Amino acid sequence: MPRLTRRFHARDPVTLARALLGQVLVRVLDDGERLAGRIVETEAYLGVIDRAAHTYGGRRTPRTESMWGPAGHAYIYFLYGMHHCVNVVAQGPGEPTAVLIRALEPLEGLERMRAHRAGRRPKARLRDTDLCSGPAKLAQALALDRRLDGTDLVEGEHLFIERGRRVPAGNIVTGPRIGIAYAGDWALRPLRFHMHGNPHVS
């Protein structure tokens, strides 16, 4: 399948968050195995004006540098000292906005995903719907961490997004983002999007 282009990513984060639904996130492991999942849930982060964004107020740190760069790159951060989350940089240089990928519908490499998720509990048997139903879960399932932060999702070898299927506007559910109560009124804005009726959402 063809990959998404730079132009696809270079738009405002709300438009991109909706457009990413139905597209396919691909992770190629060091041994060549392909893991892939359809994007079924996203959240938009609007940069310097958004109290929930890591770049709110123009904050620029080594951790957030990827958000300030070109569209179509990965911004991967470590949360609570336990979990990684993967974002797609939107717009372009100097416009630090991004889309958080919240959930995937696993398509390829499910057994490898299951092994990654089981970790030290190799006998645990996770259902397909539990493999990638949350940002931390999908990062663990696909073996994503800070080493892949800044990866070019258009031209990269180990992490990229392929064109999937367009989700009609009528099949997209909109609501508030999750886990950002600290952001005041911004916590209530309808910036979370997911595919209606999909069992893999978080």
Residue ranges, per PLM feature:
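Conserved, well-structured core segments that form or line functional sites
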Residues: 1-202
